[in-house]
Amino acid sequence: MFKSITFMSAILMATSAFAVDSPITGNVSSKCSIFTDKAGVYGNPSPDELSTLAADGGVLPIIRYDVSIADYYTAKISWPNSFSSSPTLTDSIAWDGEVSVSSTSDAGMAGYEAAKVEYDNHTEYDLTVAGSTWFTVESEAVYGQDKSLPGGEYVANIVAECIAD
C-alpha cells in the first residue's frame, strides 16, 4: 500500500501543470508633437481691452505642430475664453479670437486654412501631410460696458491638442 501511494504521488507530481503569467508590453510614442514657438503678449490699446494684435501693442503667439505620419491626427486649437489669473474683475469679459495657419513645411499643406473647422472658441485642422505647421492665435478681451480693466497681470491660456483620428 505504501508503495502504491508513493508511486501515485510521484506520477501526480510529474504530471502537475504550473501556470505562468507572461506579460507583453509595448510603448507608443506620439507621432504628433506640439510646441510654443513664440509666447503671446497682450497689448492694452484702450482701458477696457487686451489684444495680442501687433497694432494693439501685443504679440501673436505661435504654436507649432510636428507630425511624422500623415492622416492620423487632427490639430485642435482653442483661443482663450477666460483668464487663468487676473486681478479681481467685477464685470464680464467679451472674448474673441482667431486661429490661422501662418507657415508650413510642405506645399501640400496649403489647403489647411481653407479646410479648417471653427466652432465656439475652437479651430480644428486635419493634418493630412507629414511635417510642421505653424499657427498664430489672435486673442481679444473686452471688459464690461466701457469699464477700465483693473491694473495687474492678466494670464490666459491657449489649449492646443493633437487628437488621434
Residue ranges and their predicted role:
Residues A107-V129:
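Extended, solvent-exposed segments with strong compositional bias
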Residues S85, V101-G111:
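Substrate-binding/catalytic groove segments of enzymes
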Residues L12, Y73-A75, A115:
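Short, Φ-rich (hydrophobic/aromatic) sequence segments
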Residues D91-S105:
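Short, surface-exposed beta-strand/strand-loop-strand elements in extracellular ectodomains
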Residues M1-A19:
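Gram-negative bacterial Sec-dependent N-terminal signal peptides
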